[in-house]
Amino acid sequence: MKKYWSRVVSLVEKPENLFLALSLVFGVISAVLVPQLSVSDENMHYLRSYSLAEGRLESKRCTYPKVVDKRAGSVYKGNISADYSQQIDRHDTKTGKCSSATGYAPIMHAPQTLGIFIANLFHPSTGLTILFGRLANLLFYSISVFFIICWVRVGKWVFTVVGLLPLMIHLAASLSSDAMTNVAVFLITAFTLNLFSQTSRLRRNQAVALLAIAGFLALTKSVNGLLLFPLLFLPARLFTPNKRLKKVPQVLQKLPCNIQKWSLLVGAGLVAIAALLIWQKIYGASLLTSGAPDNPLHHNPLDFFRILFNTYINPNMGYVDVIIRGGIGEFSSFKYHLPLFVLVPCFVIVLIALLKRDPAKEKALAPHTRRLAIANITTILLFIAAVSYVM
């Protein structure tokens, strides 16, 4: 008995192990039991993933097997039952309008595509391809966040709790591309915290990693590029002073800003922009939604404040409940959700995770907490503005 208890204790002591165990257990349950294609826009992500699994990168007119196209469309008629019997005839195809998920870069559907490809090797039915795509997405999310928790220096328990929120597992155990987006957000957040808590100079491999992450963020969702904003406030100790940069002309060495820091940040921004432009060139069409030109805020920008009031503040509106509860467990296109009382233990657990701190590891971060907090709040405001005005 003591042997098994010691294993449980060792599991709980390491947040990354606890995350991986719970994520896989509840994720598999969700992947199997949640009705297929019932998750928000899952049928669109299924069409995109299946097309990529067939090796087709299409943008304007897309070709799918008729069985796959019919299965995706049957959701609108209320059919969410899985079909494991009828095999997909890949030669009996239909060409028509592409799914709304086609504008995403292929990296957003890479795990689902691999799962569908493997399913086609065994028994190419719609039921099995959807299930394998879900499981592959879950594995990618769980393993990625596991390594991110291992890697981040501070806030490991916060990463664990947020990564295990019911909505996060629900999306990861589906064909949704939001799992990839969530991994990207976890990654840049961990990278930012590691840099702020680092006492030594920035290493070359970290600079390369930053450039790669910048491109990755842009390819998930373009608005994620705003997550690079807190890096503008990185402490000076990470960078070599201008006077010690031997290859830099003396005129530039007298600049008030750190050349190494701003060269890296400008480079990260250029990589993000280049990644977007390259994908748009490959895709052959605009990546913004078709409704963007008709955005009412373009005609009256002051409506932005009215929308904010009616969304977050006005007590007579029902959106507050959707937003707060939706962040925890509003599932499947808002058709069903967790009971409201679940919010209380969820927020309590998040609070406990915030209190679980290691002062030794946070020592280098402490002088910059105010600066980082301002940067994060500003980033959130930029997100709201970007989504409201551009998307």
What are these regions (language model features)?
Residues M1-K3, F191-R201, V208, L227-L270:
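Perimembrane helix-loop-helix junctions
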Residues S23, K363-M391:
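Transmembrane alpha-helix segments characteristic
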Residues A53-G133:
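Interfacial juxtamembrane loops and adjacent helix segments
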Residues P124-G127, F146-L167:
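Transmembrane-helix signature of polytopic, membrane-embedded enzymes
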Residues F147, N182-S200, V208-A214:
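Specific aromatic-rich, kink-prone transmembrane helix
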Residues H170, Q206-S222, L226-F233:
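Membrane-interface alpha helices of multi-pass inner-membrane proteins
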Residues S174-T181:
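Short acidic/glycine- and proline-prone juxtamembrane loop motifs at membrane-interface regions
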